[in-house]
Amino acid sequence: MKVNPSVKRICEKCKVIRRNGRVRVICDNPRHKQVQG
């Protein structure tokens, strides 16, 4: 899980979602998981 000031999609399967007021990237590849904060 990466914590970045700006989250971006890395591959085609990455999805940007809002969960509990935080922007997240979820993906099949665990290395692509990100959260904005």
Curated annotation (Swiss-Prot):
UniProt family annotation: Belongs to the bacterial ribosomal protein bL36 family.
GO cellular component, one term: cytoplasm
GO-annotated molecular function: structural constituent of ribosome
Alphabetized HAMAP family for the sequence: Ribosomal_bL36
Lineage, top ranks: Bacteria, Bacillati, Actinomycetota, Actinomycetes, Micrococcales
GN (gene name): rpmJ1
Protein keywords: Ribonucleoprotein, Ribosomal protein
Matching InterPro entries: Ribosomal_bL36, Ribosomal_bL36_sp
Protein known as: Large ribosomal subunit protein bL36A
Gene Ontology biological process terms from the UniProt entry: translation
